[in-house]
Protein backbone atom coordinates (compact mmCIF):
# COMPACT_ATOMS: atom_id res chain seq x y z
CA UNK A 1 0.00 0.00 0.00
CA UNK A 2 1.42 3.34 -0.99
CA UNK A 3 0.71 6.10 1.50
CA UNK A 4 1.89 9.58 2.31
CA UNK A 5 2.72 10.20 5.96
CA UNK A 6 2.97 13.70 7.41
CA UNK A 7 3.91 13.90 11.09
CA UNK A 8 2.98 17.04 12.99
CA UNK A 9 3.38 17.97 16.65
CA UNK A 10 0.05 16.53 17.84
CA UNK A 11 -0.89 14.03 15.09
CA UNK A 12 0.16 12.07 12.02
CA UNK A 13 -1.76 12.42 8.76
CA UNK A 14 -1.92 9.29 6.62
CA UNK A 15 -3.10 9.63 3.02
CA UNK A 16 -3.46 6.51 0.84
CA UNK A 17 -2.24 7.07 -2.72
CA UNK A 18 -4.31 4.40 -4.47
CA UNK A 19 -7.92 5.10 -5.53
CA UNK A 20 -9.32 1.89 -3.96
CA UNK A 21 -8.66 0.41 -0.53
CA UNK A 22 -8.75 -3.39 -0.46
CA UNK A 23 -8.89 -5.56 2.66
CA UNK A 24 -5.18 -6.42 2.47
CA UNK A 25 -4.35 -2.71 2.21
CA UNK A 26 -6.47 -1.93 5.28
CA UNK A 27 -4.64 -4.69 7.16
CA UNK A 28 -1.33 -3.06 6.15
CA UNK A 29 -2.69 0.30 7.32
CA UNK A 30 -3.53 -1.31 10.66
CA UNK A 31 0.08 -2.41 11.01
CA UNK A 32 1.34 1.11 10.26
CA UNK A 33 -1.10 2.61 12.76
CA UNK A 34 -0.15 0.07 15.42
CA UNK A 35 3.38 1.46 15.13
CA UNK A 36 2.09 5.01 15.53
CA UNK A 37 0.24 4.02 18.71
CA UNK A 38 3.62 3.19 20.26
CA UNK A 39 4.93 6.71 19.66
CA UNK A 40 4.53 9.75 21.88
CA UNK A 41 2.39 11.49 19.23
CA UNK A 42 -0.20 8.79 18.61
CA UNK A 43 -3.16 10.65 17.09
CA UNK A 44 -3.98 9.87 13.45
CA UNK A 45 -5.88 11.68 10.73
CA UNK A 46 -6.75 9.39 7.81
CA UNK A 47 -7.21 11.57 4.73
CA UNK A 48 -9.23 9.60 2.16
CA UNK A 49 -9.33 12.37 -0.47
CA UNK A 50 -7.60 10.23 -3.16
CA UNK A 51 -9.81 7.20 -2.43
CA UNK A 52 -12.87 6.70 -4.62
CA UNK A 53 -13.79 3.15 -3.56
CA UNK A 54 -13.34 0.85 -0.56
CA UNK A 55 -14.07 -2.83 -0.03
CA UNK A 56 -16.57 -3.68 2.70
CA UNK A 57 -13.98 -5.63 4.68
CA UNK A 58 -11.52 -2.74 4.46
CA UNK A 59 -14.14 -0.33 5.79
CA UNK A 60 -14.83 -2.66 8.71
CA UNK A 61 -11.09 -2.90 9.50
CA UNK A 62 -10.81 0.89 9.52
CA UNK A 63 -13.75 1.11 11.94
CA UNK A 64 -12.02 -1.41 14.24
CA UNK A 65 -8.80 0.57 13.91
CA UNK A 66 -10.54 3.75 15.05
CA UNK A 67 -11.89 1.94 18.11
CA UNK A 68 -8.40 0.64 18.90
CA UNK A 69 -7.13 4.24 18.94
CA UNK A 70 -9.88 5.47 21.25
CA UNK A 71 -9.31 2.47 23.55
CA UNK A 72 -5.64 3.56 23.69
CA UNK A 73 -6.63 7.12 24.63
CA UNK A 74 -5.70 8.50 21.20
CA UNK A 75 -7.63 10.19 18.39
CA UNK A 76 -8.41 8.71 14.98
CA UNK A 77 -10.26 11.02 12.59
CA UNK A 78 -11.16 10.35 8.96
CA UNK A 79 -11.49 13.26 6.56
CA UNK A 80 -12.31 14.15 2.96
CA UNK A 81 -14.26 11.02 2.06
CA UNK A 82 -15.81 10.89 -1.40
CA UNK A 83 -19.52 10.08 -1.91
CA UNK A 84 -18.87 6.50 -3.12
CA UNK A 85 -16.83 5.72 0.00
CA UNK A 86 -19.46 7.39 2.17
CA UNK A 87 -22.12 5.16 0.57
CA UNK A 88 -20.15 2.02 1.48
CA UNK A 89 -19.74 3.23 5.07
CA UNK A 90 -23.45 4.08 5.27
CA UNK A 91 -24.48 0.71 3.79
CA UNK A 92 -22.39 -1.08 6.43
CA UNK A 93 -23.85 1.18 9.15
CA UNK A 94 -20.35 2.41 10.01
CA UNK A 95 -20.63 6.07 9.06
CA UNK A 96 -22.33 7.09 12.31
CA UNK A 97 -19.71 5.19 14.34
CA UNK A 98 -16.75 6.87 12.66
CA UNK A 99 -15.27 10.24 13.50
CA UNK A 100 -15.51 11.88 10.05
CA UNK A 101 -14.92 15.49 9.03
CA UNK A 102 -15.33 17.17 5.63
CA UNK A 103 -11.84 18.72 5.63
CA UNK A 104 -8.40 17.97 7.03
CA UNK A 105 -8.43 21.31 8.84
CA UNK A 106 -11.57 20.27 10.73
CA UNK A 107 -9.93 16.94 11.55
CA UNK A 108 -7.01 18.86 13.10
CA UNK A 109 -9.54 20.76 15.22
CA UNK A 110 -11.15 17.51 16.43
CA UNK A 111 -7.76 16.06 17.41
CA UNK A 112 -6.86 19.22 19.31
CA UNK A 113 -10.22 19.32 21.12
CA UNK A 114 -9.93 15.66 22.08
CA UNK A 115 -6.38 16.27 23.36
CA UNK A 116 -7.67 19.09 25.58
CA UNK A 117 -10.54 16.90 26.77
CA UNK A 118 -8.14 14.08 27.68
CA UNK A 119 -5.87 16.51 29.54
CA UNK A 120 -8.83 17.82 31.54
CA UNK A 121 -10.14 14.34 32.31
CA UNK A 122 -6.67 13.08 33.28
CA UNK A 123 -6.29 15.94 35.73
CA UNK A 124 -8.32 14.47 38.58
CA UNK A 125 -7.72 17.55 40.74
CA UNK A 126 -10.03 19.88 38.87
CA UNK A 127 -11.11 22.64 41.23
CA UNK A 128 -13.90 25.09 40.72
CA UNK A 129 -13.70 28.51 42.29
CA UNK A 130 -17.03 29.14 43.99
CA UNK A 131 -16.11 32.47 45.59
CA UNK A 132 -18.71 35.07 44.86
Located regions from the model:
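Non-catalytic signal-transmission and effector/linker regions of two-component phosphorelay proteins
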Residues: 1-5, 121-132
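Amphipathic alpha-helical interaction surfaces in cytosolic regulatory modules
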Residues: 26-98
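A charged, well-structured terminal subsegment
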Residues: 102-127
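General small-molecule cofactor/ligand-binding pocket signal
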Residues: 6, 79, 101
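Charged, low-complexity, helix/coiled-coil-prone segments
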Residues: 1-13, 45-58, 107
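Short, solvent-exposed coil/turn elements at secondary-structure transition points
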Residues: 11, 19, 82, 104-106
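STAS-typified acidic loop motif
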Residues: 2-33
Amino acid sequence: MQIKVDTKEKFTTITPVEPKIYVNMAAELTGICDGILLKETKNVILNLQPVSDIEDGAAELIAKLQQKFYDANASFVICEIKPAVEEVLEKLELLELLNVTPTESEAWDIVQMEEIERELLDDGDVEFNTNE
